[in-house]
Each structure stands twice: as C-alpha cells, then as structure tokens.
Amino acid sequence: MNAMAVYTKVSEAELTAFLENYDLGALVSFQGIREGIENSNYFVTTTAGRFILTLFEKRVKPDELPYFLNLMTHLNRKGIACPLTVVGKDGLNLRDLCGRKACLTTFLNGKSARDITPACCAELGAAMARMHLAGSDYPADRANDLSVDGWAALLDKIGAAADTVEAGLAKEMAADYADIKRNFPSGLPRGVIHADLFPDNVFFENGKLSGVIDFYFACNDALAYEVAICLNAWCFDAGSWRFNPDKARAMTAAYQSIRPLNAAEKAALPVLARGAALRFSLTRTFDWLNRVPDALVTPKDPAEYIAKLRFHRSVSDASVYGV
C-alpha cells in the first residue's frame, strides 16, 4: 500500500488489548506492511472498518508527534485528502503499544502509481501546491532536521563506509555537500512541507490523485525545496534513472497554476534539487549500511539517488525543470 515497514512485532493479544481503548468493534485481522523504511505499520481490520496502525520508531521524537497528527487534521479540514487519526474513548489519539508510541489512522482508498506518467506528475504538482496553501495557517512549527546541517551529521556517521557502496563515494558526497552548502539559498518562501512526497505516499484512483499519506517527516521549510524533492522522486524514469523533462514540465506547470514560484525560487531550483538528491543519497546509504536484523523492511538501494545527484550537478538553469 505505501512507504511503510515493520520493526516492532505486535501480537494478536497485544493489539486486541490496544483496541479496547477505541470504539472500533472487534479485531478481525491484521497484517504487517513490508514496504518502506520508517516506523512499524500494520493493516488492521475490525468489525467497524479498516485502519492503519503505526508504531513510531527510530527517527521520530515523541514530543514531535502532535505536530504530525494535528497537521493531518488541519489539512483534512482544508480539503486535502489525507488520513485522520482515530480518537480513543479517552479523547486521546496517541498511546503506548509494545514500548512505542502508537496511533491508528483512517484507511485511504487508492494505490500508488506504478507507471508514473506526466499526467500523474501534473496531479501531484497541483496537490502539492494545494497542500502548501492549506498549511499556510498551521500554527505549529517544526524545523527540518534533515536539511543542510543534518546532512553534515549523516556524512560524518557514514564516513569512509560509503566506499563499500561505490568506490570513491565518500569523497564525492563530501564534495557535493560542500558545494551545496556554499550555494544553498536562504530567504525563500517557507511553510509546511510533507518532505517525503514519494510515489509510495501518494494514492490514485481512476487516474486522479485520491490521497496523501505518511506525514511523519513533515516540517517547516522552503516550499520550493518540496518541489525539488518531487522533481527527484517523480521526474526520472524507473530503471534507467534518466531525467524526464516531460514529467518535470507537467509537475511544475500544474504546481504553478495554483501557487506560482517567484524568481528567487526558480533560480534556486538547481541547487535545491541537487540538495534533495544528496539528502536521499545520504539517508539511503546510511540505512543500507545499518540494516536492522530481522526487521520486516526492504532497504532502498542508494544507487538511484547517487545517479540523480550526478544529474543535478550538471544543471545550472532552472528551465531544465520546466520553469
């Protein structure tokens, strides 16, 4: 279904006891969700319907969880198709399960696009812009801990081990980081971004975007940085990892039909896109090198984002991205 995983195993007895906190009827079935890299997730079916159970794992700080959960409520009320947290009999939407903070969210219909077309990219671009506008009055603030300073920390943690992924990679990524940091823009329009708008986190029905899930990287950052993330995630062809300008034009045109980028945002897109590619190169390399034994999870191959990073290194004009 989506970009999720299982690190913490939940038994039927534990889940049954957990569900007693809710008016959701009896447990019918549950199944771990294999895809993704963050948190532990299960499909849960009760006599009242279908839900997603999330147990929050390594990168999520418990005191930041209200930011994510309340954001989904805020966006949903503004007409954005995203999950809602389920409130228990005690009025709480967050509680403990198996030593982790956990919540239930509503189940969204639809599925991820496996064949990403320019039409899919246009749907995504428009939805992203609507989400940016809908989040403009969200009162909470959360820094992006996987922005430029966070990349430096990841580089240090990975160190020379990057060369076991590809010879010379440690030096290459360090040089990219230094150049990106030197040229990284400031003062761009900011707001709430999803920060993980990958195809696995976006659902479609009958060719139309039907929902966005997995808001647990959401933060306040430059809105154009989200556009850059999506250029990476949506606008390269699967397998070859070649940049597809038709997809990029479709996405950026649809975005700008709702929220036009200003001149500074357009000029910054090449370095933002390169920075986004580095960010995912680093996290994928780190996760590849630090796999969790026995976890029901599929690590992402960092080679894809290393290839994208090399592409963006050659781009100096944002017109390449269709703006």
What are the language-model segments listed below?
Residues 34-47, 52-53, 85, 178-225:
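Active-site acidic catalytic loop and adjacent metal/ATP-binding pocket
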Residues 3, 145, 157, 280-323:
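ATP/Mg2+ or Mg2+-diphosphate-binding catalytic cores
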